[in-house]
Amino acid sequence: MKILIFLFLLLLSSCVFEHDAFIPKYPNSVLPDGDPIPAASRSYMEGVYKITSGGKQFGDRAVLKWHGKDFSMFSETQGCYFVMKAVHLDSVIFMEGYWRYSSNNTTGLASLRISKANGSRNILSGKDGKIVIQGTYGIADGLPDAELVLEYERPFSDKVKQSDFYIMAHRSGGRNSDNLPASENSIEMIRYTRNFGTTGIEIDVRLTKDGVPIIYHDDDLNVRTTTKSPLIGPVKNFTWLELSSYVRLIHGEKIPTLEQALTFLVDSTELRAVWLDMKGDVNAMKIVIPIQQKALARARAKAHPLEIWVGLPTEDVIDDFLSYPGHEKVTSLCELAPEDVRKVNASVWSPRWTLGTQVDLVKQMHAEGRKVFCWTIDDQQFMKKFIDEGEFDGLLSNYSAMTAFYFYTQE
């Protein structure tokens, strides 16, 4: 028996789990030779575009949306997104980056431009006008050689411009199974998630053996979430020092503490919402809520508009929340029935997506001054239906780029 156990452990330790997060790199980039697109000019590029060449790969339409000095594009096919950088050189706008499908690993390079005749002069001088984006795209690490042309169709609708809709990313951006370039629930993923059009994130909160709140989804340390380490077993069996010293997430990052994650988010992102998914540790509220309040105070001091909701997914977590002195003043999100939402006076009700659009109940929550989010919706047809026909204030998804496309293309 001892020999069998040894052989099993040897086999387990030799297993290698591949996490294919290939990102193609553009050789001989023109970007270092150009100047950044002026902040005042960027909004003139934003809007809905018609794809007149390349539609077989990406669909009929695309959305262009800036985030800081970079921008993303979103199209309907497989929740495709483009991660792009842009400069202007001699009044021509050059754009380089890569595209990828949300629902699988298909990816490739993209090289685009807006010539003087096709709108770059108007954009750079802050004027409306015709815009045609021309260029090429590739597959995998091949150089771009297939034509891609996008023609500006319209700006975002008034409905979109006036909306306070939240594009919420699951596990700070996506799951490890989605083969993204950063691990789920990592600082690096919080940095990367803006490429999906994300405006808010959900993160999972657990306590270590010595009571430090960390961001980690599973009960135990395993090959799905971490690289091989000498630590095996439930997360709660280890101190923060032990986890920090010996455990790395699948892309080499350290497991962040809740305080580290929120501090980074406040200081280094434009995200405006955080959903703390409490995983049910006993007496966690007395530790987590002060960290939530500290992060909110930091955001206010930096004039960073931010909401942080303590998630209440079970009755036990609700009981812990209600036992916290002054819980009435703590912003929370409840996943249970409307009566539970009212009992805890939650700021947000968040039912699972399989319950449907529930328009009447959503309107009741709105009448009571609450927001309503739906989780975790990844099916494209239902996502479109929920945005077009529902009254939700936000959707939580592993594929936020899909959410962004359907939201920004609303008429």
Positions of PLM-derived features:
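Sec-dependent signal peptide recognition
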Residues: 1-9
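C-terminal motif of bacterial Sec signal peptides marking the signal peptidase cleavage site
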Residues: 11-14
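Phosphate-group recognition and catalysis centered on beta-loop-alpha active-site segments
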Residues: 16-411
